[in-house]
Amino acid sequence: MRTGSNESAELMELLSAERQFSMYGPSHWAVIAVFVVGAGLLVWIGRRQTEAQARRLGRILAVLTAAIFGSVLIYSLFPPSIGRSVPLNLTDLATAAAVCAWWSQRHWAFALTYYWGLVLSTQALITPVLRGPDFPDYRFLGFWAIHVLVVWAAIYLTWGRRMRPRWRSYRFVVVVTLIWAAVTFTFNSIAGTDYGFLNTKLTTRSLLDIMGPWPVYLLTATTLVVIVWALMTWPWERIRRPAKQGPQPV
């Protein structure tokens, strides 16, 4: 009986290990496929909606995003831990901004979602920081639902509803991000945590691996993000100016 129990325990451990999420495994590719199809569908829908229809869809998706985000936050409290229960990761702020953007479609919320979602949240699709069970575990579902919905919000509002970032949007998001980084870095230093990976580099593979050791990667990443965000703003401003100026008198 003891031998059988040991064998059963070993089998359960093996099955559990096999169910762990694997980067670019079948479940990861499935998420990417759902993301691509959903993004295309949202753009198609967004371009054909009336204002009332867009408001209704936005509020439905805002409630969905908020419900999932709230569930994730509640889960992080059991048991409470200073290292994971405080919503200081940029993902937390991006999700809150996406909820506001879905619901209100206000420009400040759109700006945060556009820059944070399209550059930072998409990193979860490429190099997910997910250490845990694979589909259909609730941690897997919560992680991917949050990140996918944030990026979907940015895509829907930009290419579906045709909202556009401005240079003032760029400046606003840079300032907000720097304030978040300063507050979070200070909190990490006092509490011994690593929210935002500002005080210690990720242990899983990520783009930070090619940016040097700490604190070099912070400077490298900041410079790169600021440049990329500027490049994400410039084309829209180029398009907007001729339209605003209109035909010039001869």
Residue spans of the language-model regions?
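Membrane-interface helix-boundary motifs at transmembrane edges
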Residues: 46-58, 103-109, 160-170
